[in-house]
Amino acid sequence: SFMEPTSDWLSNLKIRASYGTTGNDMDLSKDPIDKVDAFSYLQKYKLGEKYIFGNNLANTIVAGATPNYALTWATSTTYNGGLDFGFFNNRLSGTFDAFYRKEVDILGPRTVTLPSTYGQALAPENYAERSWRGGELALTWMDKAANGEITYSAYLHLGFARDRWDVLDEDATYREGGNLHALSKQGKAEGILTGLIADHLLTDPAEVEALKAKGFKQFGRDPYLGGILYKDTRGDGYSEGPDGRIDSNDEYNLLSENGTPRINYGFGGSIKWKGI
């Protein structure tokens, strides 16, 4: 009854909300077959190197990875809200959805330095966190013309989604102050794009000869006319700054944080005459 004043233009309105949480046995390797190592919460032993004692070749037994007594599931929690609506006797209708998903306690290795005398590897721990967020809008217009003999419609879909690593252990090279800190996944999406940065095509013979005269090499080869000249961005050990050559160190540049499309859209329509 409270919607009666709007009934001449508002035909439908529905608000939706949902919440759910579930366990997930995937780890940072994201391997669908080799997930959590069996019995990694127990101390295991394995055969080690063989040694000669007197005239006999003897096997040895060594301890496996330090067990993780607190091993548990990763937990995925999803929040979703939506709105269904219709206007003008449902000639214009649509839906809007937004979601947020958080996954915590993802199993993965920690990047810690152990003394060589420790003698064991560390078992992976449930520590990493990752989140997803996004939304989708769908609109449809449907009407009739020519005294109802023609039925036509048009639609538009627009979606956005983004993921982010919230907690993730990385090598010191990727941490604050490291040479590859710009490529850290922390706070970024999975699947960032990295690679060489093209500067320009070598179309001037004089420029090519000048580069050769300086001893400039690209992966051990002389630059050549018509080839791509890449930017010299890093030196040995990924150090920032040019070193007079292009090699594998120069491949570590952040090209884009969007390894997968973040925005998807589509539109279209249809028309019928006398139901055909």
Regions found by a protein language model. Name each.
Residues S1-E190:
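Extracellular/periplasmic, surface-exposed regions of secreted and cell-surface proteins
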